[in-house]
Amino acid sequence: MNLFPPNMKSIRILTVLVLSALSGAVARAHDKSAELDAGQKAFLAQYEKVRVALAADDLTAAKSAAAPLAKDLAEVAKEQTKAQSAADAAKKLTAATSLAEARGAFKAVSKRAVHYAQGQKGYYVANCPMVEGGEGDWVQTSTKISNPYFGKSMLTCGSIKE
């Protein structure tokens, strides 16, 4: 005994097909690694060097790694005004005289990194709830937390958001 008339069965099949197609599109939208251009990939690679240095409490290495970021972001900011705050922050990071100052500037640079990395394969957005203002997001290439905001004193504080 068929509970649905033939045309209802066709509608159900069509609905299942449409939903299947949509779920595949959503999954592909989350994995948009092919959409990163060479400049964005270079930015994220250099950003990772800054993050690792800050997690290790190495101000000299963080400042050194931030210099190419500052230069590249200044160029991007000429065409994209949204990049200006990250460019200014990267420049401040290169001139930082303390880890606290460098980490403060790193927050603004991290906003740009999160923008690029969200949904990208191989990049993880992490968060430390202890960062003032709840703005403790950063990007890393490993699922093992390595906190750049508190370094060695709270190296594993945080969690992967996405």
Put a short name on every predicted segment.
Residues 2-18:
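Bacterial N-terminal signal peptides that target proteins for export
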Residues 20-23, 27-162:
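Intrinsically disordered, low-complexity terminal tails/loops enriched in metal-binding residues
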Residues 1-2, 125:
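Generic N-terminal simple sequence motifs
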